Curated annotation (Swiss-Prot):
Source species taxonomy: Bacteria, Pseudomonadati, Pseudomonadota, Gammaproteobacteria, Enterobacterales
Protein name: Oxygen-dependent coproporphyrinogen-III oxidase
GO-annotated biological processes: protoporphyrinogen IX biosynthetic process
Species of provenance: Escherichia coli O7:K1 (strain IAI39 / ExPEC)
Subcellular location as annotated: Cytoplasm
Function: Involved in the heme biosynthesis. Catalyzes the aerobic oxidative decarboxylation of propionate groups of rings A and B of coproporphyrinogen-III to yield the vinyl groups in protoporphyrinogen-IX.
Cofactor: Mn(2+)
Length: 299
């Protein structure tokens, strides 16, 4: 089957609806929708839930942008895209819970196609999901990674190990020599063996996110916590901000293509703190996080 951008767009809009419904069912609060248009072509639907029962902030964004020429960030490592019109669409979401024992989560699925007359279209899928705990629970990490592995298995034995490794490498803060969290899946430039296969995999990742995340939320959301845990959560959220502003290609692409800044930066936590030369106490649960987020085989 030829690449069908309309089919992908319909799936993405439905996925946004489904994920918002599932998060609302857990939290009780409703999302507020903000529809926007991009002057250069396209637009999107940003949905944000704030100060809910479980989630301090959850943002689920759909965007579909198109234009006559590619931005520098995209053509730098893909010169074949120069001189082509493009369409980029995706659903991207980040959930920042109140309770420090509930991890932050991020997921994204996207499709890109660039065309010019008389040439075959250049297209690919990308996406994944990753988990950023503040306090490590082995059973949560195992569930997260088993869910990721199980959704990958129908597409091949090598898919989960490959995309887990890519995720570990991508969500890494070089300037801190730290992983952002415990990873999950990350894939990009997926266009083989054919459109149908790649689209099916992207759908599996999009649908798999809540299966991986919501059982962890349910397990941890009522755990008692105090000021110490909250302070540590806010401190560790700083790493999230550092990664998104310094290393994340998606953030850079969005800002360079004249995307909607409010939507692009919706992934930012609502409250964060930095502390100069912070060192957790030896033997404390906070100190244990550094070991917990080191790359390992969870399944």
């Amino acid at each position: 089957m030829k690449p069908d951008a309309h089919l992908v767009k319909q799936f993405l809009l439905n996925l946004q609806d489904t994920i918002c419904q599932q998060l609302t069912a857990v939290d009780g609060a409703e999302f507020v929708e903000d529809s926007w248009q991009r002057e250069a072509g396209g637009g999107g639907r940003s949905r944000v839930l704030r100060n809910g029962g479980v989630f301090e902030q959850a943002g689920v964004n759909f965007s579909h942008v198109h234009g006559d020429a590619m931005p520098a960030s995209a053509t730098a490592h893909r010169p074949e895209l120069a001189g082509r019109s493009f369409e980029a669409m995706g659903v991207s979401l980040v959930v920042h819970p109140h309770n420090p024992y509930v991890p932050t989560s991020h997921a994204n699925v996207r499709f890109f196609i660039a065309e010019k007359p008389g040439a075959e279209p250049v297209w690919w899928f990308g996406g994944g999901f990753d988990l950023t705990p503040f306090y490590g629970f082995e059973e949560d990490a195992i569930h997260w990674h088993r869910t990721a592995r199980d959704l990958c298995l129908p597409f091949g034995e090598d898919v989960y190990p490959r995309y887990k490794k890519w995720c570990d490498e991508y969500f890494y803060l070089k300037h801190r020599n730290e992983q952002r969290g415990i990873g999950g899946l990350f894939f990009d430039d997926l266009n083989t063996p054919d459109f149908d296969h790649c689209f099916a995999f992207m759908q599996a990742v999009g649908k798999g996110y809540t299966n991986a995340y919501l059982p962890i939320v349910e397990r941890r959301k009522t755990m008692a916590y105090g000021e110490r845990e909250r302070n540590f959560q806010l401190y560790r959220r700083g790493r999230y901000v550092e990664f998104n502003l310094v290393w994340d290609r998606g953030t850079l692409f969005g800002l360079q293509t004249g995307g909607r800044t409010e939507s692009i930066l919706m992934s930012m936590p609502p409250l964060v703190r930095w502390e100069y030369d912070y060192q957790p106490k030896d033997g404390s649960p906070e100190a244990a996080l550094n070991e917990f987020i080191k790359v390992r085989d969870w399944v």
